[in-house]
Amino acid sequence: DKANKKTSHSIFKKSVQIAAAIIVPFIIITTLVYNAGNKASPLSDMIVSVEEGEKANIILPDSTKVNLNAQSLLSYNVNEFNRKERRINFSGEAYFEIAKNNKPFIIQTSHMEVQVVGTSFNLRARDENISTEIDLLEGKVNLTSNTTKESILLLPHQKAILDKKSGKIKIVSGTPVESTAWRKGQLVFHGVDIKEVFREIERTY
């Protein structure tokens, strides 16, 4: 166990230096390296994984702040991020404060693409849930369904719910207090299946 902790700590320090990301403890950082013979090429992907019962705050190379909830996974290409665009892959739940930049910030989930420039929102894209939800607090967000290719512009105080089965997106009134309660260590449920309530409690604690 001690050896594993030392290895994780070493990878953490190296990853921060190379990717310019600031990451709090209790998360797993993995960098993928492509080998050519005995020589390793520069680091390609940064992967941030938050385990069950934990949370994490990270700052991406463009100064975007991300507050990750338990059982979340975020990754991006170190060499390509913030060149022509700022693209990440994501699953789980997180609160994003996107740094203002003329390069679009794109979040790719398994069922939806989220494109923004500078804004704040909560994104819930857990693989086991029947929907993907985004609650917008500030700015504007363009959403595109991977299934139907439907694009919708989301405005402040609106919430988008994408049905994974049909791929359709519907817009409802935002519930920022409810959707971001987890950031304060609180769980708020409204009209949620009891199984999901138990899953969230298990995930959080």
Language-model-detected regions and their locations in the chain:
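A residue-level detector for the "anchor" residue at the start of short, highly conserved motifs
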Residues: A3-Y205
